[in-house]
Design a protein with these regions (language model features):
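Conserved alpha/beta-hydrolase "acid-adjacent" motif
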Residues: 111, 120-133
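Short, solvent-exposed loop/turn segments at secondary-structure boundaries
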Residues: 27, 125-128, 160-163
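Short beta-strand/loop motif that positions the catalytic acidic residue
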Residues: 115-117
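A general structural detector for well-ordered alpha-helical segments in enzyme core domains, enriched
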Residues: 130-137, 167
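Short, conserved loop/helix-junction motifs that constitute active-site signature segments
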Residues: 8-9, 104-109, 141-143
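Catalytic active-site module of serine/aspartate enzymes centered on a nucleophile-bearing elbow/loop
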Residues: 139-179
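Active-site nucleophile elbow and catalytic-triad environment of alpha/beta-hydrolase enzymes
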Residues: 84-105
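Alpha/beta-hydrolase-fold enzymes
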Residues: 2-83
Length: 179
């Protein structure tokens, strides 16, 4: 969503999946991450950042209900075990930017925005409360065409869920809709 700050005029529609909610502790996290980067090193793994952020969990069951997809993730040699300090800093910086309303130019207020999330993805989306906050923030920025859909019995990676055909059908319908 930070891309919208200066580039919403460059896109016709915006699709969000597994829509991330704003973390109220992001400003504090940024200060801690800055401290860790300076004193431990950007490429190191700070245990306190890992603990506070939750980034680097080995349990991947929050991703999807599809056990085959989780097995693929667990067997993928390219999956990182956790984020280094600069990685956590980047995530918290992006999260912090979600609420910096004054930085959004909102040059395309009629931009159609569709958010597709799993109802069981409370950790990332913040659940109904987090999604409502996201919608209200987008509206405060100036966007008028925001549709938030939660799919029951789905987790974070709705594109990799067991019933993902429902997601793909909704995506196709969104992009085929006329303005």
């Amino acid at each position: 969503r930070n891309y919208l700050q200066e580039h919403d005029k460059d896109i016709d529609k915006l699709l969000l999946t597994g829509t991330v909610c704003y973390q109220k502790l992001a400003p504090v996290g940024l200060k801690l991450a800055d401290f860790a980067n300076r004193f431990v090193g950007e490429e190191q793994h700070s245990w306190i950042l890992k603990k506070l952020s939750g980034y680097g969990e080995t349990d991947k069951s929050w991703l999807t209900n599809d056990l085959e997809q989780i097995a693929k993730v667990n067997q993928d040699p390219k999956i990182i075990a956790g984020y280094d300090n600069i990685g956590v800093t980047t995530i918290w910086t992006a999260d912090y930017g979600l609420k910096q309303i004054e930085k959004y130019a909102c040059q395309n207020p009629d931009l159609p925005i569709l958010s597709l999330s799993g109802a069981d993805d409370v950790k990332i989306t913040g659940g109904a409360k987090g999604l409502l906050d996201t919608k209200q923030t987008l509206a405060a920025i100036g966007y008028r065409r925001i549709d938030m859909i939660e799919f029951p019995n789905m987790k974070h990676e709705v594109l990799n869920e067991i019933e993902n055909e429902l997601i793909y059908q909704r995506i196709l319908a969104f992009f085929e809709e006329d303005e």
